[in-house]
């Protein structure tokens, strides 16, 4: 059986091969709805399958989007990657995922690999690119969108949450319960970059405490973002002579580790210790007790990031407002804070 070609589709649809290409590639020129329907019907009838490799060579782009995350084992990043994958599929794209493990060299490794594969664009969920890597992005004329992390340069394109405001909501809520003060479990000095959301979470905690006339001195505790290290830090913190009455954790993963430490030490939550987190991962609702936390619309953020990375015009022009999309944070009240 002879291979079906684009010429065959054009003959059956009564149009040119160029128009068939416009339909298949969704551009660059518009096609009348009636003509589009004829082409799609011809493609279906003939069973035509476009040669994506040839298309990529001709256009110097593929149907791939590169996504680099710090650690896909962490629930927040896994859920964000899943949301990006769904958003990309809605646009006819596929996603390649790389894990940087918070190491700049690994991030650059995936960056170069994805650019070499002619991805349509890159979405970076946390970044630590050096000047050489930034120059390489420019040399490849790559589309790059930051997701979840605030940009360092004014011309960067980013999709973020109101991390600072969300943290303030959580800490204010804990203080409204009448606790003497709220401690904070932040990140570590080694991991944050300039736009790291956890830095905003800590700053939001500081501002809420200051508003209440409370000192933050000696009440910020470092812990890696994952539950396992947070559990170990929690055991030490909760076993100390000055156990905090309430703790705001910069991530839900930290909070889940802290809850495990409290349970092991037979500390009642929220009776003897109130806890709040940030991210509203799926496990937050299943925690014991269910975790009060801060949520954002990850699906909408992912769609926005995909739309931006595929937008040809935004790279050339666009206001600061168009380049920085800030999604609101919402307080999700459950039982770990002391609410019934």
UniProtKB/Swiss-Prot annotation:
Q: Name one GO molecular function term.
A: DNA-binding transcription factor activity
One Pfam family, short name please? Answer: Peripla_BP_3
Question: Which part of the chain is the HTH lacI-type domain?
Answer: 1-59
What keywords tag this UniProt record?
A: DNA-binding, Transcription, Transcription regulation
Q: Which InterPro entries match?
A: HTH_LacI, LacI/GalR-like_sensor, Lambda_DNA-bd_dom_sf, Peripla_BP_I
Q: Does the keyword Nucleotide-binding apply?
A: no
Please give the name of this protein: Uncharacterized HTH-type transcriptional regulator SCO4158
Q: Which organism is it from?
A: Streptomyces coelicolor (strain ATCC BAA-471 / A3(2) / M145)
